[in-house]
Swiss-Prot record:
Cofactor detail note: Binds 1 FAD per subunit.
GO MF annotation: an example: flavin adenine dinucleotide binding
UniProt entry keywords in alphabetical sequence: FAD, Flavoprotein, Oxidoreductase
Name of the protein in its database record: N-methyl-L-tryptophan oxidase
Family of this protein: Belongs to the MSOX/MTOX family. MTOX subfamily.
UniProt binding sites for FAD: 4-34
Domain of life: Bacteria
Protein EC: 1.5.3.-
S-8alpha-FAD cysteine modification, residue list: C308
Cofactor: FAD
Biological role: Catalyzes the oxidative demethylation of N-methyl-L-tryptophan.
Record text on subunit structure and interactions: Monomer.
GO CC entries: cytosol
Length: 372
């Protein structure tokens, strides 16, 4: 049997692509080395931020606004346990922060609902937060966080119900291209399709070793927190930059535990077994202490944590491009620790590619040619 589309890697982007391509009427095969959602990639840990006024650059704003529309649509499938929670996101940092300047610029260019607060205004609205006098806050009222594992589970179930073939716990060991399309090799045999999407996350280099992606081990952890830090008390999700440039992110507390992680840093790794569990690196449990001590001093001890992996591109911008010499294979990788919020729209872009539709977005900034 020859498929219209084979998806290699059915985590964040692949799960979305499988759903949108199947919904469009294509004959799709989703594959994954594990059983998604799982703990082996970048999507576990329950929650991910979604920010609209994008500090990583204005080029992302059209993508994230479309992503939000798709997240809202997906959330309607889980109204009792919504995939998107509009908690608001407060971006904290020094007044001269380049990241916050990008947030403000994106908000202005796209007329987004962002409120600027000085240090006193931040602490008056959220007494749990402490910041120096030279800090500002940019509050995104319409942003919030996503239930990452629930989203993937929902997409996979919806795709299956729509008739998508799914081959999980079955690693793809090789990709071949010929005049008839794409063939993948797995331990279960070979499968053919007209087109392929490669969104294998951290370990894309196992299949495509020439791709400029560097896996980095990262951790996040949950700390003791009471109801003051919860959504019910209108405590927001947040990003925060310390005076030394270190960047943190976090979420409102749930079940008396507040999740926080450090965006920069981490350990460069070259194989899956190098991603050791949380607490096996000495700094894991204390990584968030500088932020907590200075900005959220009421938070208690570390309760537990987890390790994940970033698939970093050299410039930490996404890679969305066809493989050189193979226009029937789309590569989506290098999401560099800020990709999950875009999973919905990247899945839609992949489905459009499979249907020979021109993308509605300018994907030029994400081409591989920028590294040449």
């Amino acid at each position: 049997m020859k498929y219209d589309l084979i998806i290699i890697g059915s985590g964040s982007v692949g799960a979305a692509a499988g759903y949108y391509a199947t919904r469009a009427g294509l004959n799709v095969l989703m594959t994954d080395a594990h059983m998604p959602p799982h703990q082996h990639g970048s999507h576990h840990g329950d929650t991910r931020l979604i920010r609209h006024a994008y500090g990583e650059g204005e080029k992302y704003v059209p993508l994230v606004l479309r992503a939000q529309t798709l997240w809202d649509e997906l959330s309607r499938h889980n109204e009792d346990d919504p995939i998107f929670v509009r908690s608001g996101v407060i971006n904290l940092g020094p007044a001269d922060s380049a990241f916050l300047a990008n947030v403000a610029h994106s908000a202005e260019q796209w007329q987004l609902n962002v409120e600027k607060l000085d240090a006193q205004g931040i602490m008056a609205r959220w007494p749990e937060i402490r910041v120096p006098d030279n800090y500002i806050g940019l509050f995104e009222t319409d942003s919030g966080f996503l239930r990452s594992e629930l989203a993937i589970k929902t997409w996979i179930q919806l795709a299956k119900e729509a008739g998508c073939a799914q081959l999980f716990n079955c690693p793809v060991t090789a990709i071949r291209h010929d005049d008839d399309g794409v063939t993948i090799e797995t331990v279960d045999g070979e499968y053919q399709a007209k087109k392929a999407i490669v969104c294998a996350g951290t370990w894309v280099k196992d299949l495509l070793p020439e791709q400029p992606v560097q896996p980095v081990r990262k951790v996040f952890a949950w700390y003791q927190a009471d109801g003051r830090y919860s959504v019910k008390n209108k405590f927001p999700a947040f990003t925060g930059e310390l005076p030394n440039g270190d960047q943190y992110y976090g979420f409102p507390a749930e079940n008396d535990a507040l999740k926080i992680g450090k965006h920069n840093g981490g350990q460069v790794i070259h194989s899956a077994d190098e991603r050791v569990p949380f607490a096996e690196v000495v700094s894991d449990g204390s990584e968030a202490f500088p932020f907590l001590r200075n900005v959220l001093p009421g938070i208690g001890c570390c309760l537990y944590g987890a390790a994940c992996t970033y698939d970093n591109s050299p410039d930490e911008d996404f890679i969305i491009d066809t493989l050189p010499g193979h226009d029937n294979t789309l590569l989506i990788t290098g999401l560099s620790g800020h990709g999950f919020k875009f999973a919905s729209v990247l899945g839609e872009i992949a489905a459009d590619f499979a249907q020979d539709k021109k993308s509605d977005f300018d994907l030029t900034p994400f081409r591989l040619s920028r590294f040449q």
